[in-house]
Amino acid sequence: MSRPLAALAAALIGLTVTLVGLTVNVHDAEAATEQLPDLRMRRLTNFYIQQASNGDKRLRFTTRIANAGPGRFELHGYRPDTSTARMNIRQRIYNTSGTYRRIEIPRSSTYMFFAGDGHNHWHVHKLQRFEIRRLDANGNEGELKGTGAKTGFCFWDNTTYNLSLPGAPQTAYYTSCGTSRSVNVKMGLSVGWSDKYSASLAYQWIKINGLQDGNYRVRVIADPYNWFSETNDANNGTWTDIRLSGGGTKVTVISSS
């Protein structure tokens, strides 16, 4: 082989090696796919009406927020010192290689705050929304009649949802939401796990003062403003139709989603 041809062959071999190396890197990047969470609200349960000492009528019920996605739902709160009342929030999105990227959530959207309401831990502002609407004779939703009193939510792996989902840990991974002295807080929901807020907990109610007897729809939505990244924003809600009677002293469940 002549010297020019040999040089050309060597160059082509080098180019091939380089291209193969590039191809491997591209494939490695493609293999590391992101695993987003998928937030859902489970069926509402344990409805009852509380007559408060101040005269309010409170419709109480139990909620459960669940993660049915391929990836964990993980939020990190942080503040510079303990004198700062609110924490900024970052969401971590993990991928199949075990690394992650961070998404900064604007403070104007939401934040974490500490609540000494018997829970004594950090909460995400407006992670869920409760509402009640009147139903007409055909079962169609009418105007909004009330919203939930609760504005902050802590969440961790405290009840199982579906441990047969791929990647679901068989034991709880997220177990707390920090203390009043925390400057960094990690809270989350693992794949296949859910967080339960019992009907009796602080602010777990909708005020129903003045509502006439009749049929209503109670709806609860997770991440109602779509601040957080997940696989599907269209399946975040659940509803239950109820009947109020006895001048707002009795509640009966009619049907649920």
Task: Please place each PLM-identified region on the residue numbering.
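Exoplasmic/lumenal beta-rich domain surfaces
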Residues: L127-Q128, D136-Q212, K250-S257
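A short tyrosine-centered beta-strand micro-motif
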Residues: F130, L211-A222
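Bacterial N-terminal signal peptides that target proteins for export
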Residues: M1-L12
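Short amphipathic, basic-aromatic surface patches that mediate peripheral association
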Residues: R60-H121, E131-G139
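Beta-sandwich strand segments
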Residues: A32-D38, P70-H76, N138-G146, S198-A199, ...
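Boundary/junction segments of secreted and surface-exposed precursor proteins
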Residues: A32-H76, V251-S255
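C-terminal region of N-terminal signal peptides and the immediate post-cleavage residues
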Residues: V17-T33
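Short beta-strand elements
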Residues: E230-S257
